[in-house]
Every structure is written in C-alpha cells, then in structure tokens.
Design a protein with these regions (language model features):
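Divalent-cation
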Residues: 1-142
Length: 142
C-alpha cells in the first residue's frame, strides 16, 4: 500500500489517510484531526516530538529494526501489525490502524493489507457511500 494522501474534511472535521494498493484497492483509515495535521507535515517539523517518533527512536536505541505495517482484521475490526527484528528474530506487535499509519509515515515503513482488511475497507466504503450520498462528493473522508 502507498499513502495516497492525508485529509481533513472541512465539513465535519474528520481526518483520514487514504492508502492505495498496486491493484487500485483503496483503504481509508480514519484519523483524528490533530493526528491528520501532524502527519500531513511531511518533514515532521514540530517543536515537540510525537509519541510515534519517540517510539521509533527507542526501537533504534534498543537495537530493534522496524520492518513493515500490515493492516488486518480481528473480530470485525481493523488493526495494524508492526513487524520488527529483535536479535535476528522477527516479532510482531499489534496497534491501532491510526498508530500503524503514523508508524508508516514517520518510520518510512512499507505497508500491506490482508485480503480480509481490503474486504473490510471495501464494505465500509460501501456503507459510507450509502449513508453520505448527498453533497459529500468523492473527496469526503467519511
């Protein structure tokens, strides 16, 4: 998955990260507006480090190398999995999809999605189109 864009809806204030696969599959991760604004600054130029940046720094300081972020579904909910290497062994931790996007952006990590995550995203997009079919238009985040 490639990060297509990060937006904040002018109408409702919701934020979202649009991820697109090579096959055209689209996944939108809802972000709170503050996180969306933080992540939309490509260079991370803020006076205060984010928690994600601290976490990535601590991984490096402890000899842990982050690998990739994988979006998956568990119990009908989207989640992100961060893989990393510790002492030559692969390990995985789960986090929220929002945290996964932050890790992707700030850690310059590759992202993937399971077939279940893509199907989940497609079904959510279909419901969003049904409920917000009015003046929202194609750029509406929700």
């Amino acid at each position: 998955l490639e990060l297509e864009c990060i937006r904040v809806c002018d109408r409702c204030g919701r934020g979202g990260a649009e991820l697109r696969g090579e096959d055209g599959a689209n996944v939108v991760i809802t972000l709170d507006p503050a996180r969306a604004r933080e992540l939309s600054r490509a260079d991370g130029s803020d006076e205060i480090r984010s928690l994600t940046e601290l976490f990535l720094d601590q991984l490096a300081a402890n000899g842990l190398e982050p690998g990739e972020v994988v979006l998956d579904v568990v119990d009908g909910r989207l989640r992100a999995l961060l893989s990393f290497v510790r002492e030559g062994e692969s390990d995985v931790v789960s986090c929220t999809p929002e945290e996964g996007v932050s890790l992707m952006v700030r850690g310059d990590l590759k992202a993937y999605a399971t077939d279940e995550a893509l199907a989940h995203a497609a079904s959510r997009a279909g419901r969003a189109d049904h409920h917000h079919g009015g003046s929202g238009g194609p750029d509406t985040v929700h």
